Each structure stands twice: as C-alpha cells, then as structure tokens.
C-alpha cells in the first residue's frame, strides 16, 4: 500500500543506494511490527518439492539479500521461502560501481554486481541471529580470484559450511558477471562439478543425519540442445531441483534504450517470455524427474501462474519487487493458490 508512494522517492537515488535504503526501511518496519502496512496477506497453499514443504510457492530469489542480513524482515512479507546469497568462500567487493541500473520504461534491471558479499562466515552469523524457521535456501558461488578450473573447490567449501544451516542449497553457475562462470554449464565441466557436489552432499547427509537438497541455477541463454544436455546431467547426477532462469545477456527486448550497452545481466519484464520458454522445454526434458523453480520477469500474479503452467513447481521474485513493491508477494501467492486449487 505504501510502496507506490515511496517508489518515486527511491527512484531518485541510484539503484544500489535505493536497494540499501529499502532493506533498512523493511528492517525498521519489521522491528516496529509495521510490515502489514507494506504487504498484503499471502494465501497459504502448501507445496511439496525437493522433500520440503513450502507454505506457498512464492519465494524470494537470491541476490536481494546477499549476506542474509534481512531474513526476518523479508520473510514477514509473506514469502513461502527465502533464498539468500550468492555467497562465496571469502569476502569480495564485486565489480566497480556503478553496477546496477534501472530501465523503468521496460520494468527491467541491468546488473553487473559480481557476487559482492561478506563471505560465507558472515552469512552464517546472520543466519544464526535470524528467528526465521521457514524454508531457507542458500545460494553458493565461486570467488572471482579462483581460476575456473578450481571452481569446484569453492563450491565444495561453501557447501561444507552452509549445509547445516540451509533447507536447500543452490549452485549458481549462471551469473554472467563472474568471468567464465557460465562455462560450468557445459557438458563435461558440468558433469564433473555435479558429480563432486553430489558425492559431498551424500557424505554431509551421513555426517549431519539430515539430507539437504541441491538445486542448480541455469541461464536463459541456452539453446534446445544445451537444455537437453543439462537436464540429462542433472538427472544423471541425482540433483534435487533446478532454478530457471538467471539474467540474460540478450538486449533484443530493450534495443535502442540508452542503457542497452551497459554490461551485465538483464532481468525483469524483458526476460519473462524467454524464462518461461526455458522452463517449458526443461520440464519436457526432465519428465518430472525434479521440480523446477521458475524465476524471471514475474511482475504480476498472472506472470507467476504462467511459470507454473509451463512446468514450474515454485516461483521466485526479485526485479518485480523493485517495480511493484512488497504487495507483489501476496498477489502472486493468491494467484498461484487459486491456480493450484483449480488444477487439483
């Protein structure tokens, strides 16, 4: 209710400063028990996926709360699950500023953040301080200084550390803002990475007496052959879920915009159709072998339903929150609940 009034003020700041201010305001509102003024109630529609029970299928995508410093305030908005990160083994600053740009005419964002985060130890401190008892995903990546041939070491180091704190762990191999990272989506390299992660996951499950599912986040910039190969490797290595999709390098939908040439990943409305197309093709290739979490360009309840209709079991929001505000969470939860009830 308040966000339409606040948005013009926030948009006077550069995008990254506005992001920081918004999170501080949410924290303050949560402490003062004022969150209901910012968000509408979310419908309860439990979904079973990856062996977990999600109160509703609408989650927060990774990237908004990289360090897990705002979990409680964000959870109070009505999300069915929260995903924090991307986190790397060691702290890193990310790419030079400016690195986050709004394209309001397209309801889009370009970012080249570069996995800026305080490191896995700091994230875990924040998780321990949180009171949140719901489904918490932790998204892991590699440090920029780690050679791509040693990337598996960073992913394993993160997995070791976050395992006990996470409801599920997401392996981010699709950010366009870490040099050569998307190479890890390719056949042999992806196969080796997934095999190593699966082996470690099973060892950690024995060690902790608890199985924590692994999901992999993929890019929208994949052809049909690549989608089929990724589906085969995910299934063959016993991965528990897949998140489709990350941001796109394509600028076709924003051609002619003054910021078109800014480097980084494009998100928001322009990626909606491509993300949904990847979900539909991935769903066909997987044949129900694992759940898909659909993300990309969700700015309305209808957009969320579109992802479920294409084959996703769950959805996630990020850029839509920047343009629509916290009310989007409840809108998507109500729309998806209505869709799932009608389907069942």
From Swiss-Prot:
Pathway: Pyrimidine metabolism; UMP biosynthesis via de novo pathway; orotate from (S)-dihydroorotate (quinone route): step 1/1. One of its GO terms (biological process) is 'de novo' UMP biosynthetic process. FMN binds at residues 62-66, 86, 139, 172, 217, 245, 268, 297, 318-319. Binds 1 FMN per subunit. GO terms for molecular function: dihydroorotate dehydrogenase (quinone) activity. Keywords: Cell membrane, Flavoprotein, FMN, Membrane, Oxidoreductase, Pyrimidine biosynthesis. InterPro entries: Aldolase_TIM, DHO_dehydrogenase, Dihydroorotate_DH_1_2, Dihydroorotate_DH_2, Dihydroorotate_DH_cat, Dihydroorotate_DH_CS. Its cofactor is FMN. It comes from the Bacteria. Its EC number is 1.3.5.2. Substrate binds at residues 66, 111-115, 172, 177, 246-247. The active site is at 175 (nucleophile). It is an enzyme of class 1 (oxidoreductase). It catalyses: (S)-dihydroorotate + a quinone = orotate + a quinol. It is found in: Cell membrane. It is a peripheral membrane protein. SUPFAM superfamilies: FMN-linked oxidoreductases. Monomer. HAMAP family: DHO_dh_type2 (MF_00225). Catalyzes the conversion of dihydroorotate to orotate with quinone as electron acceptor. Belongs to the dihydroorotate dehydrogenase family. Type 2 subfamily. This is Dihydroorotate dehydrogenase (quinone). It comes from Chromobacterium violaceum (strain ATCC 12472 / DSM 30191 / JCM 1249 / CCUG 213 / NBRC 12614 / NCIMB 9131 / NCTC 9757 / MK). The gene is pyrD.
